[in-house]
């Protein structure tokens, strides 16, 4: 089937396996119920997927709805990390119609897998009933600003306030949550202000730098020149001259924040577990491509 719904080209496609071995530092498997993402984030690294899928359409204007063989032996993934939404958002607006992510979660019940859901949506609250049944599950929301105008310039996903409200609801349901401050835009993202808003409703507070490469580098640099001309010299230093001092200073700032609030400060994620409310683990995910290993066992290669 192929049709255009609200300006988005929708295709239904068959796939042999919904699981893909992951090369991410968190390891395990990438699980993407869709190809493409209609949030249309201007900085989305996943836009590179078009090279492999053959899509000619602009990123954010298409969505492939996957159909896969039912997972009949979920125990096969016991103890494995499953990242749902590594190159899509399983809770894109079209999930309300197609329900792929809910179907996936239903098939994973009893797996005893370590499941990480990455999203920018508040639709995840619909599935709290399933999340409770899955046991070791973590839900992560990307929040890199409290400014709705900047957010709207960057993506068409749920508002920041809706994401924060969803995080609170999921956290209070007893499910581990992450505030993923990603990407940190130099001179724009105020991660301390975000921390103040979410520290009582998240277990982990991840920090990741804005990494500009490929086609979206020009998009972002042009945006900065047009909206934040005073930041052009800083972006030139970081992204053309490869000066790392800005993010190195942010690492120091983040570690001091961790000390102030009595929070653990680590280079990578801690093993699954909850932490005392108000003391989330602060994860230094800057330049994460240098981290090898998982669960804070990896070392940085500088």
Regions found by a protein language model. Give the residues of each.
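Conserved Radical SAM active-site core
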Residues: 1-138, 146-149, 160-161, 165, ...
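Auxiliary Fe-S-binding modules of radical SAM enzymes
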Residues: 2-14, 192-302
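Hydrophobic faces of well-ordered beta-strands that scaffold small-molecule active sites
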Residues: 29, 82, 115, 139-141, ...
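Conserved radical SAM core fold
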Residues: 83-92, 122-125, 137-157, 186, ...
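Anion (oxyanion) recognition and catalysis
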Residues: 109, 171-172, 199, 259
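Glycine-enriched alpha-helix->loop->beta-strand junction motifs that scaffold or abut catalytic
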Residues: 133-139, 199-204
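Conserved strand-turn element in the central/C-terminal portion of the radical SAM core barrel
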Residues: 156, 168-189, 240-244
């Amino acid at each position: 089937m192929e049709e255009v719904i609200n300006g988005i080209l929708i295709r239904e496609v068959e796939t042999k396996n919904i699981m893909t071995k992951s090369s991410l530092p968190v390891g395990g498997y990438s699980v993407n119920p869709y190809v493409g993402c209609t949030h249309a984030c201007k900085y989305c690294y996943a836009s590179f997927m078009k090279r492999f899928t053959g899509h000619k359409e602009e990123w954010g204007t298409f969505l492939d709805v996957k159909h896969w063989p039912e997972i009949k032996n979920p125990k096969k993934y016991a103890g494995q990390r499953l990242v749902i939404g590594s190159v899509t958002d399983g809770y894109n607006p079209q999930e309300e119609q197609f329900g792929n992510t809910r179907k996936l979660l239903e098939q994973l019940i009893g797996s005893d897998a370590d499941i990480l859901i990455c999203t920018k949506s508040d639709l995840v609250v619909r599935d709290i009933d399933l999340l409770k049944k899955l046991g070791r599950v973590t839900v992560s929301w990307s929040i890199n600003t409290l400014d709705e105008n900047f957010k709207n310039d960057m993506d068409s996903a749920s508002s920041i306030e809706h994401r924060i409200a969803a995080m609170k609801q999921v956290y209070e349901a007893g499910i581990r949550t992450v505030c993923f401050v990603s990407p940190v835009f130099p001179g724009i993202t105020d991660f301390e202000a975000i921390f103040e808003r979410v520290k009582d409703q998240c277990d982990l507070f991840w920090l990741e730098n804005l990494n500009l490469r490929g086609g979206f580098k020009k998009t972002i640099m042009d945006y900065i020149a047009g909206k934040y001309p005073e930041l052009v010299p800083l972006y030139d230093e970081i992204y053309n001259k490869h000066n790392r001092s800005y993010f190195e200073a942010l690492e120091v700032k983040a570690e001091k924040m961790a000390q102030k609030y009595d929070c653990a400060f680590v280079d990578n994620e801690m093993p699954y577990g909850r932490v005392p409310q108000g003391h989330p683990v602060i994860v230094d995910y800057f330049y994460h491509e240098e981290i090898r290993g998982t669960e804070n066992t990896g070392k940085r290669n500088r």
